[in-house]
Each structure stands twice: as C-alpha cells, then as structure tokens.
Amino acid sequence: MLPSLIQPCSWILLLLLVNSSLLWKNVASLPMCAMRNDRCFMFFEDTFELAGSLSHNISIEVSELFTEFEKHYSNVPGLRDKSPMRCHTSFLPTPENKEQARHIRYEALLKSGDMILDAWENPLDYLVSELSTIKNVPDIIISKATDIKKKINAVQNGVNALMSTMNGDEENKNPAWFLQSDNEDARIRSSYGMISCLDNDFKKVDIYLNILKCYMLKIDNC
C-alpha cells in the first residue's frame, strides 16, 4: 500500500513536471493517469522518477549559472570574498549532505525539500528581476535564471501539494541581501551571493528527491 501522505496529490507534481517540458519529448504518448471513481490517479513510480530527474537537471543548471555569473563578473572587487555569507535558509533544520539525508524518514526528507523550496519563492522572483537591471549582464544569464525559476516553481508547487496535509505555511522572510543600492558592484555581489546560496540549496533538494525516488522505487546503489 502506498503511504497516505503521498497518494492523494502525487498527480499534481507529475503534471507540473511534465508541463515544464524538460527531458521528456515523447511524454504525450504515455498514459497520464488511471481513472478511478471519476478521479485521476498518477502512477506513483513515474512521479518520483520525474521529480528526481528534474531536480537533478535543475541542480546542474544552477551550478552552470553560478559559474557563468562568476566568470563574467570576476573583476568586481570583493566578489570572491572568502568571508562566509549567511544564506537565508541556513536556519532551516535540513540534512546537510547525502549521508545525513539517508538517515531521515522519507516524510521528514520530503518536508526538508518543501521548506527549502518555499523559502526560495520570493527570492527567486527578486533574483530574476534584479539580474535584468544589472548593467551589461549577458542575455544568457537572464534567460537561464528565468528558465530555472520556472522549473523550480514546478517542483515547488508539486511538493507543496504533497505536504498540504502537514503544518501550515511558514512566513517567507526576505533575505538579508535583499537590498536596494545605487552601487552597481554591491548589487552584483548581492546577486552573486544569492546564486551561490541557490546552488548550495538546490544540491540539497536534488539529493533529497533522488533519495526518495530510490527509496520508493526500490533502486539499489543510488
């Protein structure tokens, strides 16, 4: 029997993932759901297969965005300052790595991913908006950031639906680096910090969802 937490809303995540049109060229030919009592039930295995694949692809794209941004603005003073920057998600009680995540119950692991995704809802909007106003920013950076935002939103909406039976929504607070400044270098460093945090956080989400995929699909050696 499937876990009660997952069954009712798993079809929402799959629809959102499919609509993101990532990786799946022939998905239209696949059965989208099984009808039962006039309701649509998604195939459980497909949900986690797609979620894991999409999250991994997003993680790669965020890392590429970070590298491109760092390379383009490498001459900005203080960009690579080694002093630690506190990300707005650092207070969240989530596993830091794959080893920790392996020892977490799947419900708690899904909740960890949900908390990170929810915490990035407003910052993602801000990041894309801010990047478009920075002087001489390459179009490819804006395009990638916009595409990443859409794909992350798809995963976020699906995971939120899965978590809807748990605690109510927590307030999303703006990160400390939500700043309004006329100093171009300061704005570039702020955006760089945001992308760095997003890169780190989505590596975690990728780990969580793929551990869940392996757990639910009984895949060895993940």
UniProtKB/Swiss-Prot annotation:
Gene Ontology CC: extracellular space
Disulphide bridges, residue numbers: 33-40, 87-197, 214-222
Pfam families, per the entry: Hormone_1
Principal localisation: secreted
Lineage: superkingdom: Eukaryota
Sorted UniProt keywords: Disulfide bond, Glycoprotein, Secreted, Signal
PROSITE patterns, alphabetized: SOMATOTROPIN_1, SOMATOTROPIN_2
Reported modifications of this chain: N-glycosylated and sialylated.
Subcellular location: Secreted
Glycosylated residues (UniProt): 57
InterPro entries assigned to the protein according to its UniProt record, in alphabetical order: 4_helix_cytokine-like_core, Somatotropin/Prolactin, Somatotropin_CS
Tissue: Expressed in placenta (at protein level). Expressed in the tail hair follicle, with highest expression detected in the keratinocytes of the outer root sheath. Expressed in ear skin with lesser amounts in small intestine. Not detected in brain at 18 dpc, postnatal day 25 or postnatal day 55.
One Gene Ontology molecular-function label: hormone activity
Keyword 4Fe-4S in record: no
Residues making up the signal peptide according to the UniProt record: 1-29
UniProt similarity note: Belongs to the somatotropin/prolactin family.
Protein name from the UniProt record: Prolactin-2C5
Organism in which the protein naturally occurs: Mus musculus (Mouse)
Gene name for this UniProt entry: Prl2c5
